[in-house]
């Protein structure tokens, strides 16, 4: 594979056109796992082609799930196991830096298997720095047999398939909604009903709504008591819906919508007003900043206007929120993004990384423990910079928008976008209009 060390983006006069989004990473990996656990065969369409989805597919295959993947990898026919997965004792699964694989699999692999076996879940160095203790603590309350192999609270994990009893479980929701998602997805397969109580403030609630909607699509209804507790009936089997279409990735939509709000007009296809993804709300934040936004059943359109800074809590859309930090540079007044501590436990510490890279461009930035304050720049005041991407796909993509200033920008390691959007830069370039 050819490695591209950097990509230089020269100033872009205008952005204009249409883009059709690749499938959502979060939906793709949830759909594959639910299909694997379900009774029946599921055809998953508009699957995202990316590193993270490949990690899920490889793991499921190793765990005995049969599937047929189309030549373009966008459609997968999954034969469900109707319950616990099976593997040879001593198995080790390498899951890269894919949180949407590590967290739910850690829960599912605790289920009682016909043959007792142990599995090790491991990943890249960064994965071993991403906390998982809140999930492990909750699973242990339900009877799980999980051990940390290196650092307490972090992968790699050793898991034995001795079963999940269920019962009353407390889980801390303050760091990542993926922990609750993992627990919810496995709860119907536990031995007794599960009452899940949330400790602390639950972050990224729209991602929980997405999980609950998908569980409904696969035949399981969860009782949600105002996000304070959840009740799940045990000894169920997910039921295949036959076909599951994966919506376009709302987080990936943010770059194109933001580009249009700064300098043009773009119609983003593949996600619309009825999307189950919380990151669709990114468009509402742009609208509050002054962008012209219009919605359809299967599209969102953004058009340039005068942008104002904003003081906003973006806890509910943490992945799309970092794009607002770039839009802030093009606004007329300062922007404060609040309640985003969980940026620090993403693919990199995004609060620190964003502050560092924004300052390279000449921006005045204040980095707090859970907020970032950004002063705007005139189009002519951006400094030429090489942007370090920290092996974080979202940093690479959002900093591409700096080319909408009067200054070129260089993105290091642009291929890190393989995690969710391998051909992002090619798609972005199709919308460029230059003098």
From Swiss-Prot:
Its chief place of residence is cytoplasm
Q: What is its EC number?
A: 2.5.1.19
Q: Which GO terms describe its molecular function?
A: 3-phosphoshikimate 1-carboxyvinyltransferase activity
Q: Which CDD domains match?
A: EPSP_synthase
Q: What class of enzyme is it?
A: transferase
List keywords of the entry alphabetically: Amino-acid biosynthesis, Aromatic amino acid biosynthesis, Cytoplasm, Transferase
Localization, per the record, is:
Cytoplasm
A Pfam family the protein falls into: EPSP_synthase
Q: In which pathway does it act?
A: Metabolic intermediate biosynthesis; chorismate biosynthesis; chorismate from D-erythrose 4-phosphate and phosphoenolpyruvate: step 6/7
Give the binding site residues for 3-phosphoshikimate.
Answer: 25-26, 30, 176-178, 204, 319, 342, 346
Assigned GO CC terms: cytoplasm
Keyword Amino-acid biosynthesis tagged: yes
Question: What is annotated as the active site?
Answer: 319
InterPro entries named among the record's database cross-references: Enolpyruvate_Tfrase_dom, Enolpyruvate_Tfrase_sf, EPSP_synthase, EPSP_synthase_CS, RNA3'P_cycl/enolpyr_Trfase_a/b
Show the catalytic activity: 3-phosphoshikimate + phosphoenolpyruvate = 5-O-(1-carboxyvinyl)-3-phosphoshikimate + phosphate
Q: What is the protein's known function?
A: Catalyzes the transfer of the enolpyruvyl moiety of phosphoenolpyruvate (PEP) to the 5-hydroxyl of shikimate-3-phosphate (S3P) to produce enolpyruvyl shikimate-3-phosphate and inorganic phosphate.
Self-association state and partner proteins as the record states = Monomer.
**Similarity remark:** Belongs to the EPSP synthase family.
Q: What is this protein called?
A: 3-phosphoshikimate 1-carboxyvinyltransferase
Q: Could you tell me which species this protein originates from?
A: Haemophilus ducreyi (strain 35000HP / ATCC 700724)
Q: Which gene encodes it?
A: aroA
């Amino acid at each position: 594979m050819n490695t591209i060390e950097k990509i230089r983006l020269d100033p872009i006069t205008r952005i204009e056109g249409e883009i059709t989004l690749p499938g959502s990473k979060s939906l793709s990996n949830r759909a594959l796992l639910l299909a694997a656990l379900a009774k029946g065969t599921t055809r998953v369409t508009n699957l995202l082609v990316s590193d993270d989805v490949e990690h899920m597919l490889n793991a499921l295959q190793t765990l005995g799930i049969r599937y047929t993947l189309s030549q373009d990898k966008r459609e997968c026919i999954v034969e469900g196991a109707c319950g616990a997965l099976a593997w040879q004792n001593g198995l080790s699964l390498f899951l890269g830096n894919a949180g949407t694989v590590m967290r739910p699999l850690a829960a599912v692999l605790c289920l009682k298997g016909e043959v007792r076996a142990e599995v090790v879940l491991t990943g890249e160095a960064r994965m071993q720095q991403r906390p998982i203790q809140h999930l492990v603590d909750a699973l242990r309350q339900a009877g799980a047999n999980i051990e940390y192999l290196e650092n307490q609270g972090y992968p790699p994990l050793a898991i034995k398939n001795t079963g999940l009893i269920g019962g009353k479980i407390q889980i801390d929701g303050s760091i990542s909604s993926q922990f609750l998602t993992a627990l919810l997805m496995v709860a119907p397969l536990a031995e007794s009903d599960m009452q899940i109580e949330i400790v602390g403030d639950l972050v990224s609630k729209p991602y929980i709504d997405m999980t609950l909607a998908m569980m409904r699509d696969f035949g399981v209804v969860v009782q949600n008591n105002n996000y304070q507790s959840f009740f799940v009936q045990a000894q169920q089997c997910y039921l295949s819906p036959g076909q599951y279409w994966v919506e376009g990735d709302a987080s990936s939509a943010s770059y194109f919508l933001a580009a249009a709000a700064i300098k043009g007009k773009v119609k983003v296809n593949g996600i619309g007003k009825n999307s189950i993804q919380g990151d669709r709300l990114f468009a509402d934040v742009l609208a509050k900043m002054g962008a012209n936004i219009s919605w359809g059943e299967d599209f969102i359109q953004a058009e340039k206007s005068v942008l104002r800074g904003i003081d906003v809590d973006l806890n509910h859309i943490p992945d799309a929120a970092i794009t607002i930090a770039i839009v802030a540079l093009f606004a007329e007044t300062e922007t404060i993004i609040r309640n985003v501590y969980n940026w620090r436990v993403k693919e990199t510490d995004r609060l620190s990384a964003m502050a560092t890279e924004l300052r390279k461009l000449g921006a005045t930035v204040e980095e707090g423990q859970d907020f970032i304050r950004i002063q705007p720049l005139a189009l002519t005041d951006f400094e030429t910079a090489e942007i370090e991407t920290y092996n974080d796909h979202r940093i690479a993509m959002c900093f591409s928008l700096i080319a909408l200033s009067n200054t070129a920008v260089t993105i290091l390691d642009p291929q890190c976008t393989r995690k969710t959007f391998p051909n992002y830069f090619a798609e972005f370039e199709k919308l460029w209009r230059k003098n």
